[in-house]
């Protein structure tokens, strides 16, 4: 079953409101951090939301996806622009996996030869 993104966004807003009541400084700090990157407005709201969507996908954050999809649409992002941003996210994830694969090979090289030869015979 597909997620009802509009309902999910409402549930998130209610949850964040509750956190804000319990810990207002947490929400205040988040809002200050969130607005800090927007002060110069060099990228524009639509571009910031497209970047946020790409990051949301790489972080696998459903809450981020629902909030930033709505915001991207509100700021004029087209379906094609969103798809391109998601393509960038997919490529970065694949690139990161490839880069981290080299770390596995480095780790393998550090194991004693006796251990690595036992593993290769298994």
For the regions a protein language model found, what residue spans apply to each?
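Amphipathic alpha-helical segments within well-ordered protein domains
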Residues: 34-35, 52, 69-73
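Charge-rich, acidic-biased intrinsically disordered regions
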Residues: 76-88, 112-122
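C-terminal structural segments of small proteins and small subunits
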Residues: 83-108
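Short cysteine clusters
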Residues: 61-64
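Iron-sulfur (Fe-S) cluster-binding segments and ferredoxin-like electron-carrier domains
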Residues: 27, 67-81, 105-108
